[in-house]
Amino acid sequence: DRWPRIFTLSNYKTVLHQQNILTGAVVSVARTVLGTIFSLVTNALLAYIISRKRFLFRSQLSLFWVITMYVNGGMIPTLVLYRNMNLTNSFWVYVIPGMVSAFNVLVMRTFMEGLPSALEESAMIDGANDFTIFTRIISPLCKPVYATVALFVAVGQWNSWFDAMLY
C-alpha cells in the first residue's frame, strides 16, 4: 500500500504546463549563467590590476576590498540604491550587484601573485601591452582559479532565492 498502483507522469505534465514554473526555470538558468560569466570577467580584471606590483594604489585598494568583506551597507540602503538605479523588478537586479565580490577578487589576486613575474616581463620586452599580457598569458594560466570562482559564483547564484523575494 506504500507504492503507487499505476505508474504515471501526469504530475510532471501538470507542473510543466504552468507558465510560471517554466519562466522561473529560465530565469534561474539565465541568472546563473550570465551572473557567473559577468562575475568572472569583472573579478579577473580587478584581480589582475591589484596583483600587479607596479600598480600605484595596490595596498590601499586591497585594504578597501578586505573592509568591504566585513562591513555591509545593510538591506534598506541596498534596496534604496537598487530603486535609484531602476533595478527593482528587473532581471538585472540578479546579475549586476553580484558582478564584483571582494572574496573572489582576493582569491584570484592571490593566485595571480603566485605566477612568475618573468612571464609578464618577457611579454613586455616583446612589446605586449597590459591587455595582451592579461588575455594571452595570465588568463590561460588562471584556469584553475577561474573554475574555482565559477563554482562559487554559480552555486551562490543558483541558491540565492532571498533576493528574488526582495527585489
Positions of PLM-derived features:
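A hydrophobic, multi-pass inner-membrane permease signature
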Residues: 1-167
